[in-house]
UniProtKB/Swiss-Prot annotation:
The active site is at 41 (charge relay system). InterPro entries: Peptidase_S1_PA, Peptidase_S1_PA_chymotrypsin, Serine_Proteases_S1, Trypsin_dom. Thrombin-like snake venom serine protease that coagulates fibrinogen by inducing a fast degradation of the alpha chain (FGA) from human citrated plasma, and a slow degradation of beta chain (FGB). Potently induces platelet aggregation in both platelet rich plasma and washed platelet preparations in a concentration-dependent fashion. Shows amidolytic activities. Monomer. Belongs to the peptidase S1 family. Snake venom subfamily. Expressed by the venom gland. Keywords: Blood coagulation cascade activating toxin, Disulfide bond, Fibrinogenolytic toxin, Hemostasis impairing toxin, Hydrolase, Platelet aggregation activating toxin, Protease, Secreted, Serine protease, Toxin. Its main location: secreted. This is Thrombin-like enzyme F202. Negative results: does not affect the gamma chain of fibrinogen (FGG). Residues 1-44 form the Peptidase S1 domain. It is found in: Secreted.
């Protein structure tokens, strides 16, 4: 991110972080109450 700003944890409630064994795997976006949209490479 170039020129980005820090934000409060509650400002972007649709963003998701997927972790496994304390390591960040991928990011995602909530598209409704039950579904998270991720990139295809996150499934590996």
């Amino acid at each position: 991110v170039v020129g980005g700003d820090e934000c409060n944890i509650n400002e972007h409630r649709f963003l998701v972080a997927l972790y496994a064994n304390s390591s960040l795997l991928c990011g995602g976006t909530l598209i409704n109450q039950e579904w998270v949209l991720i990139a295809a490479h996150c499934d590996r």
